[in-house]
Design a protein with these regions (language model features):
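Short secondary-structure boundary/capping segments
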Residues: 22-23, 98-100, 156
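Short helix-terminating capping/connector loops at secondary-structure junctions
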Residues: 76-79, 135
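Short, solvent-exposed loop/turn segments at secondary-structure junctions
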Residues: 13, 89, 145-148
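Metal-dependent catalytic neighborhoods of phosphoester/phosphodiester hydrolases
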Residues: 18, 51-69, 85-104, 108-110, ...
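Conserved catalytic scaffold of divalent metal-dependent phosphoesterases
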Residues: 104-157
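A structural signal for isolated positions on well-ordered beta-strands in alpha/beta enzyme cores
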Residues: 46, 80-82, 139-141
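N-terminal active-site segment of His-dependent metallophosphoesterases
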Residues: 1-70, 77-78
């Protein structure tokens, strides 16, 4: 059985380039990507970091992402979306909305987590990819950008 992934990264939603908004270009890209999803019906869409251009993105940039996820789910309800935080993203912000994104078959990994015995919580990072019959057909290790505080443990709550 073939597994079909779309792998993207570095969307930088909300970016201004020399004081000019790139929102229109982002809209064009997302429209194109939705058309590809509609035509090819991949098993998973992987968004590998730098979803937003800044750690605190404008509400318009967040709305653009969430509208895209809703539209993509409508076109390919079986498709899973896996998003990981990049160095421009807030890992906590990306994970914060995950309960809402589950409706759209989307999963986020923004930060690494540690078990009580100080070992890496691999379960948080390892994501199964399913076919339309909900059989596991692949695994994805979703490793976000690691900030030094996350590695040393100084970032614990």
């Amino acid at each position: 059985m073939a597994v079909h992934f779309f792998h993207t990264s570095d969307w930088h939603l909300g970016q201004f380039f020399y004081n000019h908004s790139r929102q229109y270009k982002h809209e064009q890209f997302l429209t194109w990507l939705l058309e590809q999803i509609k035509q090819k019906q991949p098993n998973a869409l992987l968004i590998a970091g730098d979803i937003f251009d800044v750690i605190n993105p404008a509400s318009a940039a967040q709305k653009q992402l969430y509208q895209f996820l809703a539209d993509a789910h409508a076109l390919a309800p079986h498709m899973q979306t896996l998003m990981i935080a990049g160095n421009h993203d807030s890992g906590y912000r990306i994970e914060q909305v995950e309960p809402l994104l589950e409706k759209y078959n989307a999963k986020t990994v923004g930060v690494i987590r540690w078990n009580e015995d100080k070992s890496l919580d691999i379960e948080h990072l390892l994501q199964p990819i399913y076919d339309v019959d909900q059989n596991i057909i692949a695994w994805c290790l979703s490793l976000p950008f690691l900030r030094s505080a996350e590695i040393t443990g100084f970032n614990e709550h």
